[in-house]
């Protein structure tokens, strides 16, 4: 996977690398997303490797049900953060964004607001199920549990295809509104419930109503804080990944518009799988495809002239394993130069 690399300085032009993300020390949340099959996981893994060089601790999280992180690093990951082999400050975990609310409401240990939601009374579970989007949104609490307890400096999300990603980014708002509603109902009907429960306020399953509401309020405050951080460009950014084809470009534009409506910063696009036929090549298919790619690449550059557009080559070998990912990651910060 050899590539010639050079430093480029185009004056006022946006730098065609992700170096600005590495340089922005304030960034805490980085999302990597795009249409399926465009190289999101390879890009997110490579970006995580580069960030690990300049950050104290980095956590890479997959929210894609396909869970390709394990394949990319040739190492099994689960819902608990685990150090990636060969790194001292880069960890990874895979969560299911469509996880069942029952799993998350089941007891998950002590010491954290999200985890302590376990043991909820049946009444509160019924209330939670009635809130639209809560089933997926509760999986976000699993992320908060890990992030809050382990204090990573930077968190990178390897997201699911576009539609799922946009829903996932709404989860903090969904949870915040849901928990606020639960709190409101508790305030309205709390005195009535306490009349039935008695002086100790104990639910039939042994859970204390007042303690449960305090835990919910703590979780709501945490989620509210994260929701605010997602909309702060100093703390959060989204890296769009695409290939130079019509559908991928269309999905990228839709995603950028949606992100803008959520107030989430995005100023970087990684264009993968670019063909660079060797001079004098008689491969007609390669030349024709390069011509098509060039057309869409020009559209990307015209539409997103204020973005960092990173151009990544189509490689002859699969990018799997630490060494190949490290080599690929270098092209995110130093532009690839096609053979002349």
UniProtKB/Swiss-Prot annotation:
Its EC number is 3.6.-.-. The active site is at residue 64. ATPase required for the post-translational delivery of tail-anchored (TA) proteins to the endoplasmic reticulum. Recognizes and selectively binds the transmembrane domain of TA proteins in the cytosol. This complex then targets to the endoplasmic reticulum by membrane-bound receptors, where the tail-anchored protein is released for insertion. This process is regulated by ATP binding and hydrolysis. ATP binding drives the homodimer towards the closed dimer state, facilitating recognition of newly synthesized TA membrane proteins. ATP hydrolysis is required for insertion. GO terms for cellular component: GET complex. InterPro entries: Anion-transp_ATPase-like_dom, ATPase_ArsA/GET3, ATPase_ArsA/GET3_euk, P-loop_NTPase. Signal peptide: none annotated. It comes from Chaetomium globosum (strain ATCC 6205 / CBS 148.51 / DSM 1962 / NBRC 6347 / NRRL 1970). Homodimer. Keywords: ATP-binding, Cytoplasm, Endoplasmic reticulum, Hydrolase, Metal-binding, Nucleotide-binding, Transport, Zinc. Belongs to the arsA ATPase family. Zn(2+) binds at residues 283, 286. CDD domains: ArsA. This is ATPase GET3. Gene3D superfamilies: P-loop containing nucleotide triphosphate hydrolases (3.40.50.300). GO terms for biological process: tail-anchored membrane protein insertion into ER membrane. Disulfide bonds: none annotated. ATP binds at residues 35-42, 245, 272. It is found in: Cytoplasm; Endoplasmic reticulum. GO terms for molecular function: ATP binding; ATP hydrolysis activity; metal ion binding.
């Amino acid at each position: 996977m050899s590539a010639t690399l050079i430093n480029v300085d185009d004056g006022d032009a946006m730098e065609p690398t992700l170096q600005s993300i590495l340089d922005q020390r304030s960034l805490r949340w980085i999302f990597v997303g795009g249409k399926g099959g465009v190289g999101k996981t390879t890009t997110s893994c490579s970006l995580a490797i580069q960030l690990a060089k300049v950050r104290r601790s980095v956590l890479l999280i997959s929210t894609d049900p396909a869970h390709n992180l394990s394949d990319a690093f040739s190492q099994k990951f689960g819902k608990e953060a685990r150090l990636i082999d060969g790194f001292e400050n880069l960890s990874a975990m895979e969560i299911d964004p469509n996880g069942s609310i029952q799993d998350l409401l089941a007891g998950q240990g002590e010491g954290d607001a999200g985890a302590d939601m376990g043991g909820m009374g049946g009444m509160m579970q019924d209330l939670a199920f009635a809130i639209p989007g809560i089933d997926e949104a509760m999986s976000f609490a699993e992320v908060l549990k890990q992030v809050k307890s382990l204090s990573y400096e930077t968190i990178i999300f390897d997201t699911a295809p576009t539609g799922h990603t946009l829903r996932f980014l709404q989860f903090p708002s969904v949870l915040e509104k849901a928990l606020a509603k639960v709190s409101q109902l508790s305030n309205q009907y709390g005195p009535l419930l306490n009349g039935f429960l008695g002086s100790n306020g104990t639910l039939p399953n042994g859970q204390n109503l007042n303690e449960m509401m305090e835990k919910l309020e703590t979780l709501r405050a945490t989620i509210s804080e994260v929701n605010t951080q997602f909309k702060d460009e100093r703390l959060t950014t989204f890296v769009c990944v695409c290939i130079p084809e019509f559908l991928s470009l269309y999905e990228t534009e839709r995603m950028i518009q949606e992100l803008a409506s959520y107030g989430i910063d995005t100023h970087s696009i990684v264009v993968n799988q670019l063909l660079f036929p060797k001079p004098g090549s008689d491969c007609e298919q390669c030349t024709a495809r390069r011509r098509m790619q060039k057309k869409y690449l020009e559209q990307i550059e015209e539409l997103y002239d204020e973005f960092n557009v990173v151009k990544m080559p189509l490689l002859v070998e699969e990018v799997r394993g630490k060494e190949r990912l490290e080599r690929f990651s270098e092209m995110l910060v130093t532009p690839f130069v096609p053979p002349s």
